[in-house]
Swiss-Prot record:
One Pfam family named in its UniProt record: Metallophos
Role: Hydrolyzes the pyrophosphate bond of UDP-2,3-diacylglucosamine to yield 2,3-diacylglucosamine 1-phosphate (lipid X) and UMP by catalyzing the attack of water at the alpha-P atom. Involved in the biosynthesis of lipid A, a phosphorylated glycolipid that anchors the lipopolysaccharide to the outer membrane of the cell.
Binding locations of substrate: N79, R80, D122, S160, D171, R174, H202
Membership in a protein family: Belongs to the LpxH family.
Membrane-topology annotation of the record: Peripheral membrane protein
Cross-referenced PANTHER family: UDP-2,3-DIACYLGLUCOSAMINE HYDROLASE, UDP-2,3-DIACYLGLUCOSAMINE HYDROLASE-RELATED
Species of origin: Xanthomonas axonopodis pv. citri (strain 306)
Phylogenetic lineage: Bacteria, Pseudomonadati, Pseudomonadota, Gammaproteobacteria, Lysobacterales
GO BP annotations listed: lipid A biosynthetic process
InterPro entries: Calcineurin-like_PHP_ApaH (IPR004843), LpxH-like (IPR043461), Metallo-depent_PP-like (IPR029052), UDP-diacylglucosamine_Hdrlase (IPR010138)
Gene that encodes it: lpxH
Protein name from the UniProt record: UDP-2,3-diacylglucosamine hydrolase
Domain of life: Bacteria
């Protein structure tokens, strides 16, 4: 049997082909699996479960069908969709997991994260993350009219794009450092949890890394994004493999 992991789909009405690829994946590749884990950024943006979206409705129906077939579906919030709540979770039939989460994966204890917590060199983002993950901030934000939430999300996205563009125009090595995980934080995370395998997304740099942490050989598996193709990690009792899904 196999457990599937995906992240960083960034589903958006502006990219319907990716949504269709995901729906096809749910119909044809997920049935019969042991579980499906979505480790954040399922959606490009999420400003509340009350936001009208035909695409999100279709995704909810498809995910619920997977769950109804006997394949449990788990969702961990990313930096784009951290406001996904229990209302949508019930519609989609998935269980929301905290970040980080430890699971038993065929006898191998494994740490799951979205991955943004590992990017500690990006201090500006970490400050923004701390603010927006605060329950008081979220309650106040969700209480605002939909139009105000849309405006805030657009402003935040524009600011993020401008910052990334500025970084790209500067020192390329600095851009790569800021947008990737901190090696020191990765090592500290392995030591903190006392585990030797970590699965995460966020950086859009799919790979399977082997490293030393706390005197142990550890494995860090990075999930791929769904911008120009699909990406899935398949894990079974014999190992793990990253695969691309063609449009």
């Amino acid at each position: 049997m196999t457990t599937l992991f995906i992240s960083d789909l960034h589903l958006d009405p502006a990219r319907p082909a990716i949504t269709e690829l995901f729906l096809e994946f749910l119909r044809t590749q997920v049935p019969g699996s042991d579980a499906l884990y979505i480790l954040g950024d399922l959606f490009e943006a999420w400003i509340g479960d009350d936001t009208p979206s035909t695409a999100a409705d279709a995704v909810a129906v498809a995910l619920h069908a997977v769950a109804d077939s006997g394949v449990p579906v788990f969702f961990m919030a990313g930096n784009r969709d951290f406001l996904v709540g229990e209302t949508y979770a019930q519609r989609a039939g998935f269980r929301i997991l905290p970040d980080p989460t430890v699971i038993d994966l065929y006898g191998h204890t494994t740490l799951l994260m979205h991955g943004d917590l590992l990017c500690t060199d990006d201090t500006a983002y970490q400050a923004f993350r701390a603010q927006t993950r605060d329950p008081v901030f979220q309650a106040q934000f969700l209480a605002q009219p939909l139009a105000a939430r849309v405006a805030f999300a657009q402003q935040a996205r524009a600011a993020s794009q401008a910052r990334h563009a500025e970084l790209k125009q500067g020192d390329q090595s600095r851009f790569e450092t800021v947008t990737d995980v901190s090696p020191a934080e990765v090592e500290a995370t392995f030591v903190r949890y006392g585990l030797d395998r970590l699965i995460h997304g966020h950086t859009h740099r799919p790979a399977i890394h082997t490293l030393q942490a706390g005197g142990h050989t550890c494995t860090r598996i990075v999930l791929g994004d769904w911008y120009e193709q699909g990406s899935v990690l398949r894990v079974d009792a014999d190992g793990a493999s990253l695969e691309q899904l063609a449009l």
